[in-house]
Each structure stands twice: as C-alpha cells, then as structure tokens.
Amino acid sequence: MQTLAQNLTSQGVNASLTQLIHTLANTSKEISHAVRHGALAGVLGATEQENVQGETQKKLDVITNDMLKDALKGDDTVRGLASEEEDYIVEVGDKGEYLVCFDPLDGSSNIDINSLVGTIFSVLPAPTGELSESSFLQAGRQQVAAGYVLYGPSTMLALTTGQGVQLFTLNPETNEYLLTTEAMSISKDTGEFAINMSNQRFWEAPMQTYISDLLLGTIGPREKAFNMRWIAAMVGDVHRVLSRGGIFTYPTDNKNPQKPYKLRLMYEANPMSFLVEQAGGKASTGYETIMDIQPSEIHQRVAVILGSANEVDACLNYHGLDYSEEPQL
C-alpha cells in the first residue's frame, strides 16, 4: 500500500501543498488520539463559551481548534486560516501560499455519546497584497485541495487535490496513513437518503414534497423503496455517500427565520462539494451549484443537497416546480 507521502508524489502534487497536507494529516493523528481517549483524558463535555455561530462549544471543539491553529501557524506555506471556532480570520505569515478554512471537530455533539466525529478542511490560494477577510472569499472552484478526517472505528482521511478522491486509513501500529481506496466513486443512482426528519414541518414546499415521495416508496411517484440514514455529523453522512452512494441534504428551513441554513459554506459545504464532484456526484443548494457561489462572509451558511448525481437531479426537479397553487404544508 502507498503511504500518503508516496501517493502525493505519484500525483505530482507540488512541494508546498504536500507540506501543508502533511501538516493537516499529522495534526489529525493527534486529534484522533485525543478523541480515542475521551473521558480518560477529561476532554468530554461542554465549556461555558459560545462560538461565533452562537453554539455552545464542546471541550474538544476548543482543544482541536487550538491543535490545528498551532500546527498551521508553524507551517510556512500558510498565509492565514479561518475556523468555525474563530470569530475572525487568523493571519499566520506574509509569505505563505495558501489559506486554510476548517471545521476542527464536525459533529462534536456526538462526542459525549461516543459516535462519529471528524475534521473538515479546505485549501485556497492566498492572494497577493494585504490579508483580510475578503482574501478568503473565493468561490469553491478556487480550492486547490479539500478533505476530511473521520474518527470512527478506524481513522480515515479522504482527500482531493483535483485528481479524484483518495481514501487513506491510519495504521495504528505505524501511525502512517496508507492508501486504501485509490479512487472513490459515487454511484449515479441510489436508494438511500440522509436528512434530519425532525425539521420536516419547517422545510420549504419542494423539499417537503420530495421527501414525502421518497417515503411513499414503491406505491409513490418514484416507484422505488428508499431507506433513510442520519448520523448527525456531516462528515459521517458524506463519508457514507462517498463509500456507497446516496443523497445527503440539510435544506432551507424556517425553524429560526434568522438562520434559514445550517451548514457553513467555506469550511463545510465547499470542501465536501469538491470531494463529491471529484467522485462523480453533484452538490447544490437546490437553486445553484454550491462551488459556484461567491461567498459574502467567512461564516456564511447555505442549504446543502449533495450525493448521487441522478438523485440530486431528481431533487432539483422538485425545486423547479411551481408550488404557488398548493395548500400550505
């Protein structure tokens, strides 16, 4: 099996990006160690702080954020970083070639129940001139690398540099990432969907109708049985989609009119969309392709529909219908 280093060399990834990927990968090994030790290390539970999203921070949110921030500050290829747990961008150096956006511990609410969590990251080119928040506001198409690390029964790194999606598994004996899937591929059709059904009453009419038709199975207009899956961590649900197909969505809802969207564009939706597209899938908000969105702020949120290409298209067809004459759902 190829090591991560050997694989990056075989793909012709440049030295600077290779160095940055190794920094992220090596830090993920430390995070994996902290996650595995859980209560033994006293890292479970919540802090008394909230992040910029207004969400109560878990202890491991803060710990993993600091681990990544410190590691990236020590990497001379990094110009600046943005994190879910940081109110503002963090300037690292004036000569780095890259900007890094990350969610240090996606699904952190799962920590206390010993369920799946992960790290998501996006790498963008650093523009010349003075660094500011606007330096980070690049469409997803500008990403030069993206990936996630899944901390589950085994620790796995899914990575793209624009040459497909490679999956690496951390060997606990050697502490090295080894290539276990050379090219992840999402099937075009699927019989699985992932959505938080508890929000059903808050969805827009297109998503209400789409999910209702899936639930009708063989007796409904889709004439096909579907199974629902939900891990409550984007990193876990998207990993399943990349592994065996499916559609994952966190759609627009009116549960909180001030926050109609849940997932963050820069460090959740964009990197996952890059991975999904590189594996042959599609990613949309329901009305526009996610990686074509011009960001307006670092912590911007968007609706997300991604996964098997034909099923995403089917969902988008519902969003193109006229619901003006339908009764209130």
UniProtKB/Swiss-Prot annotation:
Binding site for Mg(2+) 2: 103, 106, 268
Protein residues bound to substrate: 106-109, 196, 262
Positions bound to Mg(2+) 1: 84, 103, 105
Coiled coil: none
Pathway: Carbohydrate biosynthesis; gluconeogenesis
Biological process terms in GO annotation: fructose 1,6-bisphosphate metabolic process; fructose 6-phosphate metabolic process; fructose metabolic process; gluconeogenesis; sucrose biosynthetic process
Essential cofactor(s): Mg(2+)
One of the record's GO cellular component terms: cytosol
UniProt cross-references to NCBIfam families, sorted A to Z: PRK09293.1-3, PRK09293.1-4
Name of protein: Fructose-1,6-bisphosphatase class 1
Phylogenetic lineage: Bacteria, Pseudomonadati, Pseudomonadota, Gammaproteobacteria, Alteromonadales
Gene name per UniProt: fbp
